[in-house]
């Protein structure tokens, strides 16, 4: 299972949600040939991307973005390690083959006729280590604080959002807590975001005692 390619509007149901997400998206990962050892071994989320033949510029631009974020990931994790007062290179050998997926997400304007429990992305926390998110200027991202209140996380020019996931919460003994979030596109305009899930090598042993 590579989980690559395009998903249609309302084709994805977030775990625990009652209604499918009001979005469509295109997802890519590290491009690996069919004879790669991980692919031959049937390792999940490893393989080739599904590129549309009629849109060659998509492959060019997505690959460029994918590679740029791959440079950001190690620097962010270096900062995480410093903040935890552990070896700054703690994550390096856990990421010798990062499990990185990048998802370009399109949110249509959400009609007022839709019910209040219809979300662009239903409430959830990412299951991985860190998520690096670019979003356009239309807003719609909301995060839940410790009191259970939903607060807007409006886009800030020339910045990206970094979410801690469940894995980082476990790895850090909850010094980092995974961020529950959702999207409701009430802007009346199309919304675009690009999320990159930057996770360790598939075979990495995660031990909070480290």
Label every model-predicted segment:
Residues 1-210:
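Peripheral, non-catalytic segments flanking oxidoreductase cores
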């Amino acid at each position: 299972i590579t989980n690559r390619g395009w998903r249609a509007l309302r084709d994805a149901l977030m775990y625990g949600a009652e209604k499918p997400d009001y979005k469509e998206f295109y997802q890519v990962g590290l491009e690996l040939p069919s004879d790669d050892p991980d692919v031959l071994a049937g390792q999940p989320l490893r393989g080739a991307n599904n590129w549309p033949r009629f849109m060659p510029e998509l492959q060019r631009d997505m690959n460029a973005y994918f590679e740029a974020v791959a440079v950001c990931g190690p620097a962010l994790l270096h900062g995480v390690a410093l903040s935890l007062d552990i070896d700054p290179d703690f994550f390096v050998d856990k990421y010798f083959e990062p499990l990185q997926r990048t998802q370009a997400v399109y949110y249509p304007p959400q009609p007022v006729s839709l019910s209040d429990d219809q979300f662009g992305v239903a409430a959830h926390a990412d299951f991985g280590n860190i998520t690096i998110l670019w979003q356009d200027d239309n807003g719609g991202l909301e995060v839940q604080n410790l009191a259970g209140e939903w607060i807007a996380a409006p886009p800030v020019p020339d910045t990206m959002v970094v979410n801690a996931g469940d894995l980082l919460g476990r790895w850090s003994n909850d010094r980092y807590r995974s961020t529950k979030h959702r999207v409701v596109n009430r802007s009346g305009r199309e919304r675009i975001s690009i999320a990159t899930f930057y996770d360790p090598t598939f075979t990495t042993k995660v031990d909070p005692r480290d």
